[in-house]
Amino acid sequence: MTHQFRTTTPVRSYTGEQKKDYHQYKEQLASDFNHRCGYTDCQDHWFGGQRTFQIDHLQPWSKYPNRKNDYSNLVYCCSYVNRAKSDDDNPNYLDPCDNDYNNHFFRDKDGCIHGKTEQGMFMAKQMCLSLRRYAIMWNLEQLEIRIDRIRQVLKQKPELNPILSELLSKHYDYVKSLRLHQ
């Protein structure tokens, strides 16, 4: 069984004048990327929120200095993939806003990220997208979605409490696992 990589493709919406420092875009990028890493789709709160997330230059500014402050070249991302990509400018890196990542990546039954296409496999390897931490975070999010649904149903059907208890226990186990894999 496989799962879709993400449900929402980020959309860059900034249309104002180019800023002098790309860091000034961080709040807008966080919003445009739905507070998720553009490459792993993990929510930024698992990494400490917007404060600790980074801004990647799809085309590295060390090699393309004219794109350093170009909003269309910026990707909101976690530090792990930003460091893994570094200043690599291989054309196989796919812009998370211009490509449907569901066509290039999938999650296996455990939530681990895998590439489907040549570009997806390249990125998964280069950016270490198969790290267990990303699967754990995805599973936590899936559990939270299910828990929220059950909590709504429980208002009318309290006999479902054992199911909620089981999901909360799994959620707790994943949180413990995430702490171990930091």
Language model features with spans:
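A basic- and aromatic-enriched beta-loop-alpha substructure that forms the phosphate/nucleotide-
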Residues: 55, 73-74
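Residues immediately within or flanking Cys/His clusters that coordinate Zn2+
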Residues: 34, 75
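Histidine-centered catalytic micro-motifs used for acid/base chemistry in nuclease
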Residues: 54-61
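Extended charged
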Residues: 1-14, 22-28, 44-48, 65-73, ...
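Short cysteine-rich clusters marking metal-coordination/redox-active sites
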Residues: 37-40, 78
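Aromatic-lined ligand-binding clefts that engage carbohydrates, nucleic acids, or primary amines
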Residues: 29-32, 38
